[in-house]
Amino acid sequence: MRILSKILFCIAIMSLFSSCYTYKVFPKEYRKLVNNEPKKVAFISNPTDSLKKEISILQSSDLFIFSKDSTAAEIKIKVYPIKEGRRSCGQGTILTMITIGQVPIRFSDIYTFSFDEIKKDVSVKRKYDLKVSQRIWFWDMFVFNKNFNKKAGKALLGEYKNNK
């Protein structure tokens, strides 16, 4: 009985610490950004299972209206795998674990997102650095908006508008 209670306690502590994170988009202006421009109808030319994350980010960006019919689309989009770059190490986690999550830490990561816009045999290569950081803090356990793809979509929308 004691062993079972120790195992359950360890599982509860691990799940508590694994749920204390959230994502933030930088710069702050991108967080509330809304696309008011007319959207083009787009067709993704390479929808594979290995690119599900990238396609979800592109759909979350609200840049295009996606069609499953290639003849109805104004442009075709070829998506490339996202490249993740971690600019910080995990040493800050030690301080957070010692203080039981009361001191927040932030991992500032840069993700390189690239795709091609193909319109009538003219291909335009788009490549953006998405600045999405992960914050680990005890009180983020009560934040339920923890979807990385939506946050990366906001960052993509901001970068796309600023770098047309």
Q: Can you name each region flagged by the protein language model?
A:
Residues M1-T22:
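Sec-dependent bacterial lipoprotein signal peptides
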Residues R31-D49, E74:
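Short hydrophobic beta-strand segments
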Residues S108-T112, D121-K164:
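C-terminal/domain-edge helix-coil "capping" segments
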Residues P47-Q59:
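Amphipathic alpha-helical segments
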Residues L16-E37:
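Bacterial Sec signal peptide processing site at the extreme N-terminus
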Residues I44-N46, K78-Y80, K131-S133:
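A structural detector for beta-sheet-dominated domains
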Residues S61-A73:
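Short acidic low-complexity segments
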Residues A73, K78-S123, F142-V143:
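Surface-exposed short loop/turn segments
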